[in-house]
């Protein structure tokens, strides 16, 4: 189908480190953020976009609008976006604009992969309903995995007891984490030392992906490009993917992954 144009319009979340507010947009300074997090006692917090911010983004010439949010189990972004769609439709009953909100049930690079699929389907000439249907099927087939260098952020966010975090840190135990079908976080396993944990994660990724040669795999790293390249090399030894891409984490992803964290979505 010719003449179809698509564009991505990021809607920023806001991060807060001990009262210092940071927008998760192109101005995000990862190194400064990680320094502030390391020095913080309480740890970072985040706030999702308001319905009004989403509604402002809906304005424009596009007849088809697709929103991809953080997992509804991890953030209020999905509920805020759904509310925004309902409010917008009430105020613009006859505008002819079709809007759909995808709950990524993932985070970080997982959202990016979903956005890429939406663009692929839309530019292929599929109808709005068919784009939604096929993208939802893609989301259901996706998996997200991650390994953290430190448990500090999870501890400060109340996800771990101080004792569990202390024991894991003392024994150099690194958990291998992943997403559930609903988009929550679960522990898949653990290993002593970061390299063993990364190797375990790679094995889990390959075991969970039945059609590797047809899928794009994405690696997102927080300030550790060499580690990301190591993971890529390990994956290529075990399976052949359609493509493997590596990107650095942005704001909210840097908050959850913390310095040295690795996230995989496929």
Description of each model-found segment:
Residues 1-7:
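Single conserved hydrophobic/aromatic residue that forms the stacking wall/gate
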Residues 50-59, 84-87:
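Short, charged beta->alpha transition segments
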Residues 8-16, 20, 64, 74-77, ...:
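Mixed-charge interfacial surface used for oligomerization/domain docking
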Residues 8-53:
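N-terminal glycine-rich anion-binding loop in soluble enzyme alpha/beta folds
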Residues 71:
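Short, glycine/charge-rich beta-strand/loop segments that flank catalytic centers
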Residues 36, 90-94:
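Short, conserved catalytic or adaptor-binding loops enriched in Gly and charged residues
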């Amino acid at each position: 189908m010719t003449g179809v144009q698509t564009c991505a319009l990021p809607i920023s979340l806001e991060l807060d480190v001990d009262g210092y507010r940071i927008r998760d947009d192109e101005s995000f300074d990862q190194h400064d953020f990680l320094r502030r997090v390391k020095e913080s006692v309480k740890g970072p917090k985040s706030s999702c976009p308001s319905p009004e911010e989403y509604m402002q983004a809906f304005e424009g010439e596009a007849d088809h609008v697709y929103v991809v949010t953080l997992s509804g189990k991890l953030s209020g972004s999905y509920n805020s976006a759904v509310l925004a769609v309902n409010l917008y439709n009430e105020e613009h009953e006859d505008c002819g604009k079709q809007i759909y909100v995808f709950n990524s049930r993932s985070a970080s690079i997982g959202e990016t992969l979903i956005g890429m699929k939406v663009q692929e389907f839309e530019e292929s000439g599929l109808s709005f309903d068919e784009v939604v249907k096929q993208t939802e099927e893609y989301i259901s087939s996706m998996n997200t995995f991650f390994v953290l260098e430190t448990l500090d952020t999870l501890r400060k966010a109340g996800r771990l007891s101080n004792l569990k975090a202390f024991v894991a840190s003392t024994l150099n135990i690194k958990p291998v984490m992943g997403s559930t079908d609903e988009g929550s976080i679960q522990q898949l396993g653990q290993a002593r030392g970061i390299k063993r944990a990364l190797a375990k994660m790679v094995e889990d990724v390959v075991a969970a992906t039945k059609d590797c040669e047809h899928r794009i795999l994405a690696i997102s790293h927080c300030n550790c490009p060499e580690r990301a390249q190591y993971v890529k090399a390990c994956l290529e030894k075990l399976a052949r993917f359609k493509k493997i891409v590596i990107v650095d984490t942005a704001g909210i992803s840097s908050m959850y992954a913390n310095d040295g964290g690795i996230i995989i979505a496929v």
